[in-house]
Amino acid sequence: MLIPRKVKHRKQHHPRQRGIASGGTAVNFGDYGIQALEHAYVTNRQIESARIAINRHIKRGGKVWINVFPDRPLTKKPAETRMGSGKGSPEWWVVNVKPGRVLFELSYPNEQTARAALTRAIHKLPIKARIVTREDQF
């Protein structure tokens, strides 16, 4: 799982989900990528599930890059707890994804297999996304 080793503050405010991504919108390392089309919080478990889906489909001969890191904690109070008595304990780690952000990149020789692997990964994510290639950008 992707979680920060050490953080300055255990609990953070939730960022507003607005605007579009200013950086990380291009495929830099691989040949194909998954680009977000809407706002969402993507958890560390969803990122890991998508990574496993890609790796199981391509088996060997390819390389996967994860371009996002879940660095924000989301808190939750226990069930059947009365209101008040402070903020809950950190439960998940999420990344605030904005439209245009490239989440995963993949380098693989066969385009059809690469697109199939990325499609499987998109189904694991809680956002609408599309597959982009390095040639699409320029």
Swiss-Prot record:
<keyword id="KW-0689">Ribosomal protein</keyword>
<keyword id="KW-0687">Ribonucleoprotein</keyword>
<keyword id="KW-0694">RNA-binding</keyword>
<dbReference type="GO" id="GO:0006412">
    <property type="term" value="P:translation"/>
</dbReference>
<dbReference type="InterPro" id="IPR036920">
    <property type="entry name" value="Ribosomal_uL16_sf"/>
</dbReference>
<dbReference type="InterPro" id="IPR000114">
    <property type="entry name" value="Ribosomal_uL16_bact-type"/>
</dbReference>
<dbReference type="GO" id="GO:0003735">
    <property type="term" value="F:structural constituent of ribosome"/>
</dbReference>
<dbReference type="GO" id="GO:0000049">
    <property type="term" value="F:tRNA binding"/>
</dbReference>
<keyword id="KW-0820">tRNA-binding</keyword>
<dbReference type="InterPro" id="IPR047873">
    <property type="entry name" value="Ribosomal_uL16"/>
</dbReference>
<dbReference type="GO" id="GO:0022625">
    <property type="term" value="C:cytosolic large ribosomal subunit"/>
</dbReference>
<keyword id="KW-0699">rRNA-binding</keyword>
<feature type="region of interest" description="Disordered">
    <location>
        <begin position="1"/>
        <end position="22"/>
    </location>
</feature>
<protein>
    <recommendedName>
        <fullName>Large ribosomal subunit protein uL16</fullName>
    </recommendedName>
</protein>
<dbReference type="InterPro" id="IPR016180">
    <property type="entry name" value="Ribosomal_uL16_dom"/>
</dbReference>
<comment type="function">
    <text>Binds 23S rRNA and is also seen to make contacts with the A and possibly P site tRNAs.</text>
</comment>
<comment type="subunit">
    <text>Part of the 50S ribosomal subunit.</text>
</comment>
<feature type="compositionally biased region" description="Basic residues">
    <location>
        <begin position="1"/>
        <end position="17"/>
    </location>
</feature>
<dbReference type="Pfam" id="PF00252">
    <property type="entry name" value="Ribosomal_L16"/>
</dbReference>
<dbReference type="GO" id="GO:0019843">
    <property type="term" value="F:rRNA binding"/>
</dbReference>
<dbReference type="InterPro" id="IPR020798">
    <property type="entry name" value="Ribosomal_uL16_CS"/>
</dbReference>
<comment type="similarity">
    <text>Belongs to the universal ribosomal protein uL16 family.</text>
</comment>
